[in-house]
């Protein structure tokens, strides 16, 4: 059984991903998996450009997450003017500006800091994007719950708040 990730994304951002405008998805957490790994895109509602299927979401495509950047804040926390948001390389502890990441994520510095609430986050890099010709139902996927004995499969009944582990789809 191969492990992948099912990630919930709002229609506005799904449309930007589908049009290749958005190549990084920012999240507060990350999977405990080595890159690269497969991600299935669950669009939380039907967007006009994505087929407008109603109030319930669908899985619209998939991508490979080939890299994850650690987004952190350096400076005096609690004093926004003295804090700088940076990308940190966990191996070397060297930092770099977030400008390129913000552009690729279609975010402003304010949007990023509002979302992360001045905490750390992760930039999931999107590569090998594939948008499905026909959307898929959430029920077609099998979730994986971590237990002390390994991954336990379960039927997904509702979309994850942010993301969850799933089995790689059978038809692949």
Features from the language model and the residues they span:
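Structured alpha/beta reader/binder surfaces that contact nucleic acids or chromatin modification marks
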Residues: 2-172
